[in-house]
């Protein structure tokens, strides 16, 4: 066993005790594996990390590119406390002598083009209530489904949310929202990092949105753009649209009690998933009437709004009749330009709803908020 492998193995040795007064005043992160006491989060929103790696020479915590040096005690325990972090979900890694590894005390999440650790910095209970599990309401189910793609000549996987009443109201069919992840993530993102099931359960129970089926599939963009030689922006994730139109939608409508008309079909996505949403829906308006982009990677303004998507925006009256919901949202601290796009669409006579998530960046808290705003708008016709 070489030294690097030995060091990674050492990192896998956890402690479940409390080691310092400052850490004892913090609480265990909700994203930890069962029984693990670290990482912790204190009331100042600082994260506390601790790992046993007695043979390591240098250990850092890497949170979305910001690195914190860890200090070693005499027994080989390394610890670090971060600066206050913004509320919400953060991907992170441990860097042990230059090798980036997942903290074995964290649940694993697919993000940044690989499996990673994650830590949730909580909001206050009232603010976070919309994405928090509520024991006093009915809960839907999330199924893992597999189907075969003739286009890819491979098995694919999707996750499907059904509302709580789906099992008992067997005479009812439901509208369907196809909900896409972003670059470097996969079909697990909305269920795990995005807390979509809690958001849906809470809204349905409160009567804020209609009961619906939600489908989360892999958008063929789970790696970081530029990793494949010669790939252009137009190529990135482009193979997903034909799979969705020709294989995923028929699979869902065959296996679930789904309404099959365009008025009861929606698509939304975050970041590159927003890009895929526009690429899929705006070229297939015979199939979709509700569209949402959450911090969407949208570039069409550069060529003029009248040329975008085969000129779909040139006849505003026709577009407004066909598209019942056209939603754009983003965080106020990011620069993805959804505000400029919304204004350009409005100036062109295109009805749209713009939402600004106050104080958030290109992150899961922005997208949870966007989903929470989008859901009450759809399927209301």
Model regions: which residues?
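Short, solvent-exposed loop/edge segments of extracellular or virion-exposed proteins
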Residues: 30-34
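Short beta-strand segments of immunoglobulin-like
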Residues: 36-40
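Bacterial N-terminal signal peptides that target proteins for export
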Residues: 1-9
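Boundary at the C-terminal end of the N-terminal hydrophobic targeting segment
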Residues: 21-28
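Bacterial N-terminal signal peptides
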Residues: 9-20
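Non-catalytic cap/lid and distal C-terminal segments of serine-dependent acyl enzymes
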Residues: 27, 41-68, 72-381
């Amino acid at each position: 066993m070489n030294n690097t492998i030995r060091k990674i193995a050492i990192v896998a040795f956890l402690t479940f005790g409390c080691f310092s007064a400052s850490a004892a005043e913090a609480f265990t992160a909700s994203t930890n594996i069962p029984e693990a006491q670290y990482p912790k989060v204190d009331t100042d929103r600082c994260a506390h990390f601790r790992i046993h790696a007695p043979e390591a020479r240098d250990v850092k915590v890497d949170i979305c590119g910001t690195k914190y040096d860890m200090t070693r005690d005499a027994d080989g325990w390394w610890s670090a406390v971060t600066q206050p972090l913004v509320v919400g979900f953060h991907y992170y890694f441990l860097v042990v002598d230059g090798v980036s590894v997942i903290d074995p005390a964290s649940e694993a999440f697919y993000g940044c083009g690989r499996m990673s650790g994650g830590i949730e910095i909580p909001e206050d209970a009232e603010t976070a209530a919309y994405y928090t599990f509520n024991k006093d309401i009915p809960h839907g189910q999330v199924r893992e489904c597999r189907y075969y793609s003739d286009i890819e000549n491979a098995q694919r996987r999707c996750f499907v949310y059904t509302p709580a009443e789906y099992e008992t109201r067997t005479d009812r069919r439901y509208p369907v929202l196809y909900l896409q992840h972003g670059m470097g993530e996969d079909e697990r993102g909305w269920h795990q990092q995005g807390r979509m099931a809690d958001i849906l359960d809470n809204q349905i129970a409160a009567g804020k949105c209609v009961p619906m089926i939600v489908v989360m599939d892999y958008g063929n963009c789970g790696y970081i753009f530029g990793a494949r030689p010669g790939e252009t922006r137009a190529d990135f994730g482009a193979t997903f649209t034909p799979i969705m139109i020709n294989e995923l939608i028929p699979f869902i409508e065959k296996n679930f009690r789904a309404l099959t008309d365009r008025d009861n079909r929606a698509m939304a996505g975050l970041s590159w998933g927003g890009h895929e949403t526009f690429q899929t829906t705006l070229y297939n308006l015979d199939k979709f009437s509700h569209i949402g982009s959450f911090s969407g990677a949208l570039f069409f303004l550069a060529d003029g709004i009248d040329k975008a998507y085969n000129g779909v925006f040139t006849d505003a009256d026709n577009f407004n009749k066909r598209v019942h919901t056209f939603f754009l949202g983003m965080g106020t601290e990011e620069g993805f330009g959804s505000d400029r796009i919304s204004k350009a669409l409005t100036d062109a006579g295109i009805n749209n709803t713009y939402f600004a998530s106050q104080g958030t960046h290109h992150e899961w808290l922005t997208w949870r908020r966007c989903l929470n705003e989008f859901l009450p708008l759809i399927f209301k016709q």
